Amino acid sequence: MLLYVCLVNLLLQSPSGVDSQVALGVIAKVGVNVAMKLISNIWKGDVVRGWKCAVENKSTKTLYALGTTPVSGHLATVLPDIPPQSTGMFVWSKSRGAARGAIGVVHYQYGNKVLNIMASIPYDWNLYGAWANARVTYQREPFSNLYYGRKGTKYPTRDGNWGKVDGTKFFLTEKSHAKFKVIFSG
């Protein structure tokens, strides 16, 4: 079995010379569990909430990075294109500031369709829980549809449970720095 891992580490510096962001693009011909181990040491500094995500592409087409829809926080790494039978990894983080969690949607182009992946990691675990969802549509799906189960979207899956929607299986852990595993079959 061919096993390859390509890691690209770029450390971006702000004009003042202080590290402002770490960008990491990863394409790996490994499963989601191995991919999670490869990026287990990403969070550093003042990240309060976040999720690291491994997307395993078991389909026959490349998943092309289409961008994000941030609600709170931002994509802290490079969003990679994911070839067939490979796994791409990225990190979403929320640093100090407003009392909000790490919340957003990542979009991948798949042929003429879009794979939308949503995670919501709360700031206050006493009031909220973590939720995840996915949907394959013909356009970028807004966060509100994925979070509230609107406009034909299945209601999201609570952390600690496997969700399955549109040929996509996913699992989100219940932690402030959550692990989000996505297995896309197409």
Curated annotation (Swiss-Prot):
Q: Which SUPFAM superfamilies match?
A: Cytolysin/lectin (SSF63724)
Signal peptide (UniProt feature, chain positions): 1-20
Instruction: Please classify the protein's predominant subcellular localization into one broad category.
Output: other
Q: Which positions, given as ranges, span the membrane? A: none
The record's annotation in InterPro entries points to:
Actinoporin_PFT, Anemon_actinoporin-like, Cytolysin/lectin
Cite the GO molecular-function annotations of the record: channel activity; toxin activity
Q: According to its UniProt entry, what is the function of this protein?
A: Pore-forming protein that forms hydrophilic pores and causes cytolysis. Compared to equinatoxin-2 (AC P61914), it reveals lower cytolysis activity (5-12-fold difference, tested on erythrocytes), a larger pore size (probably 2-3 nm) and different affinity to membrane lipids (100-fold lower affinity to sphingomyelin). Binds to sulfatides (SFT) as well as to the two sphingolipids, lysophosphatidic acid (LPA) and sphingosine-1-phosphate (S1P). It seems to bind more strongly to LPA than to S1P and SFT.
The record describes its quaternary structure and partners as: Octamer or nonamer in membranes. Monomer in the soluble state. In vitro, interacts with folate receptor alpha (of target organism).
* Annotated domain remarks: Composed of a long N-terminal alpha-helix and a core region rich in beta-sheet structures. Before the pore formation, the alpha-helix binds the lipid membrane, partitions into the lipid-water interface and stabilizes the monomeric molecule on the membrane. Finally, it traverses the bilayer, thus forming the transmembrane pore.
> What protein name applies here?
Hydra actinoporin-like toxin 5
Organism whose genome encodes this protein = Hydra vulgaris
Organism ancestry:
Eukaryota, Metazoa, Cnidaria, Hydrozoa, Hydroidolina
